[in-house]
Amino acid sequence: LVEAALKDVLDTFGISSAIPHCVLAHIDIQAQLEGVKPGSTALWFQSIAGSDAANGTFDVTVDKMMRHAQDKRGKFGLYFETGQGADFTNGHGFGTDMLVHESRKYGLARSLSGALMQARQRRGEGSDAWVHLNDVAGFIGPEVFRNREQLVRCCLEDIVMGKLHGLMIGLDVCTTLHMDVSLDDLGWCIDQIMPANPGYLMALPTRIDPMLGYLTTGYHDHVHIREKFGYRVNDAMWDFFRELGVIDQQGQPTEHFGDPSWVYLAYCRRKSDTRSDQEILDEAKERIAQVRDRGVFISQGHGQSVSSLAEDLDEHIHRIYEDAKKCIWAQLPEGFEDTIPGGVGIKTQSNDRNDYILHPVSGESLDPESIRRLEKLKVLHGEKHDTLLVLSDGLNALANTTGDQARELIEQLRSELISDGRRVAPEVMVIRSGRVRAGYRVGETMFQGREGRLQIVHVVGERPGSGHRTLSIYITSADGGTWSQASKVDHNITKVVSGIAHTALVPKLGAQTAARILRGLG
């Protein structure tokens, strides 16, 4: 549905040959969709890593990626995402500098690009196809980069490496909300980086990504760098902006600049919508309000200059940023586990919140006392249960303590899972300083030596940044033999439902979605 919606917008405006659409699903899924519905996809996305083990976390291998590169058809080829630090933070650094790992990713991307071009030549399609690499610098957090200077250094290093590899490399100059980089610092970073001429920058309606909870470049930043550094939009898109009426013949913004309602009106007219302009604009206003109510920012208009946000939106974004800082450092109150029916308090090896933030591995393993507590529960229950519920603070303890949304979500999950015939344990493991992998450790302890399909359903406080205090559900199903192997269960077999809060995706719908996903896992 998302692929189709994006394709429809580009086709309707007649720019599908100038700009590709892409959905950040696993490359296997994109290839399957293209096989079922040829022409539905454009660029194929995949995150890649610098070692076989780290790539395994993304459920890819070099051989698999080579096959996808050779099978990809059309003008638009492959879109890779990389970033320094992804390998060692997933436990696959092997004592090697993260800069070396990043360069290996670029080597892999170059090889895959070559395989794509050769396959196209053999089929008589010509050798040219779009291949992009997006360096998501700073995405992981302070365990990789602490401040703005380190972020700039990383971006410059990666631009040089990418260009030396002959890649079209662009940047997602991003920073998490638990790094010591502010909204305003991000503007400084952009000015330091742009003279190195990256191939492109990401863009959002503001500098906050509401889905992933991090900061990156906004659309208004693109206006700024055109003004300051003289960069240009490519000719096809600039002509389209003129045709759309947001840029005049002299290249200056018109009264429709920064107005998504005007774009929606133009879209409807191209769809032969016969309603009056006012009716369509009123509908656009309603739809924008609906999107904003879900925590997604849509910028309208601009500030005193066309390269700045409208003042009210800028103030709103700064308030969200400040609230996110509170969420990141907050901790679960004493006795919180007692407020969750069946709650059993356990904890990880993090010494304190600072240790947890700066050393994520400490929040991925349980402390000895917690393991002993789980082992006693295992003896008590034997093999009566096949599904365990886990609740962790993650990077947003306040998502757990805001109203009763965590309790409601747990209760809804229990109800949905039992309705599906799951044998759900009565306890809920409430983990302090718990990251997603801490849930896997619970499964390894409780399911050790068992047979059959066994599940962990783990509710985690999402890292903040949307303006909503949201929870995610991580759903992991594996056989007993897999759970019995240390660290065998990982993100590559886990599904997630995100953005759950009373003010976003409500707990009941979140629980129903998780149950439906689990049914599809076997």
Where are these regions (language model features)?
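Short glycine-rich or small-residue beta-strand-to-loop segments that form or flank ligand, phosphate
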Residues: 1, 139-145, 172-176, 386-400, ...
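Catalytic alpha/beta core domains of metabolic enzymes, predominantly
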Residues: 11-16, 28-192, 196-204, 210-214
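A glycine-rich helix N-cap at a beta->alpha junction
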Residues: 13-26, 450-455
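C-terminal functional extensions of proteins
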Residues: 100-102, 110, 118-125, 458-522
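Internal active-site segments that recognize and position negatively charged phosphoryl groups
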Residues: 112, 374-417, 424-428, 435-445
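Extended, intrinsically disordered, low-complexity segments
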Residues: 215-279
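Extreme N-terminal leader/targeting regions
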Residues: 267-331
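N-terminal low-complexity, intrinsically disordered segments
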Residues: 302-381
